[in-house]
Amino acid sequence: MAASDTQSTSDETTPLVGSDESRYIPKDQIEYEFGGPIGALGMMIGFPLLMWYMWISAQFYNGQFALPSEGQSWKDFIIDDLFSKWVEYGIPSFGNWAFFTGFILIQALFYVTLPGVWTKGQPLTHLNNKQLPYFCNAIWSFYTSIVLSLVLHFTGVLPVYYMLDNVGGIMTTAIFYGISLSIILYLICIFVTGDYHRMTGNHIYDMFMGAPLNPRIGKYLDLKMFFEVRIPWFILFFLSFGLCFKQYETYGYVTPQACFMLYAHWLYANACAKGEELIVPTWDMAYEKFGFMLLFWNIAGVPFSYCQCILYIAYQEPEVYQWSIGYNVFLFVLITIAYYFFDTGNRQKNSFRRSVAGNSQLRKTFPYLPYSDLVNPKYIKCANGSLLLTDGWYVYARKMHYTADYIQTLTWALMCGFGSPFPWFFPIFFFIVLVHRGYRDQRKCAKKYGKDWDRYLEACPYMFIPYVW
């Protein structure tokens, strides 16, 4: 869920991919992440199993950990309970396949047909410093998708809550696509196109991390951008959207908790869509490779593991999670404040990056918030030509957008309460991810900027929480 995490820049013409990069990393320079090949294999196997387990526990075990009943062996439990429920409810029907495939294809169609704006990415040394063009219209795609879903719902063609009602089968479909597309893309890059970079020579690890940097279908449909910005957050939004419709049809009203989830996921989906062109020049788009980690996680992992709050509310009766008016209002206010800092902070660092590059034309897409753009911001000029922002929210905390992002996710779980462990999966997992990324970036920046990084730390001494951490 975290947006791109660096506020440093020289300009948009400074390559992020080193000029000495080769297709294979020298053996003595390989630095494995995520536990290396064994860790990568464990995650490729473990994450799909975890997603299925959490869904089964949420739907069939009252939101508690699915465990053997008294006197039941683990073998019988796995075969008779878990596997049988997966077979009955988790194997996709033709409708599930058609729905998810259609959703992906429609989003791809919107990507290449709806209005938008053009921007350019970072110069890429593996393409002789070429800057790839990006067409950004996710905001149009988002609201067109909402209108289309409402038309289909009220004409009786497809209820808005179809995905929520069939979440097991559709999740399996997404898992299948995530795994199979990762394998297919890796094999094509290795044996057909030769588009692979920074490889270790270990196929398991390399497929997990990815082979290509900027895979595209045709000239403009960038797969990394497509799957990162649209698919996961649109799915989460429509699960929440469906939850509200389902509650209204079932109870005649929509609970504050369901409204909160819809509001929370609208905030994030809209933020990703409206800020799409700000993602283009980031480290993620220019440097991170596109493999299982990004492809699977965006098409399946994010939407169908981060949705546990939605599932908890969907599968429990409203009286289970009724809170006081004051508590509900507090969480609505808290997420709104956190979103303000998240939105304006990301805008500050990205508008700074683009203005330094001489490109100050940025859309003011709804909601455009006060203090989003800095006037004459302060910065440190580094010996390598880069600029480090020391103004705005970042003078208080270098990763303040991480903190604001995390507070948003925390409110999701707080709105569900403590009756089930699964709504807390995302905040716990996300905390680990953000801390890992924060200190990873610290090491990379210290290596990249040297003594200038020490100056930067003097100006911006705190990472996550002002005066604390």
Curated annotation (Swiss-Prot):
The keyword Lipid metabolism applies. The keyword Lipid metabolism applies. It catalyses: ergosterol + NADP(+) = ergosta-5,7,22,24(28)-tetraen-3beta-ol + NADPH + H(+). It is found in: Endoplasmic reticulum membrane. NADP(+) binds at residues 349, 353, 389, 401-402, 441, 445-449, 456. Residues 1-20 are annotated as: Disordered. Its main location: endoplasmic reticulum. Gene3D superfamilies: 1.20.120.1630. It comes from the Eukaryota. Catalyzes the last step of ergosterol biosynthesis by converting ergosta-5,7,22,24(28)-tetraen-3beta-ol into ergosterol. The third module or late pathway involves the ergosterol synthesis itself through consecutive reactions that mainly occur in the endoplasmic reticulum (ER) membrane. Firstly, the squalene synthase ERG9 catalyzes the condensation of 2 farnesyl pyrophosphate moieties to form squalene, which is the precursor of all steroids. This is Delta(24(24(1)))-sterol reductase.
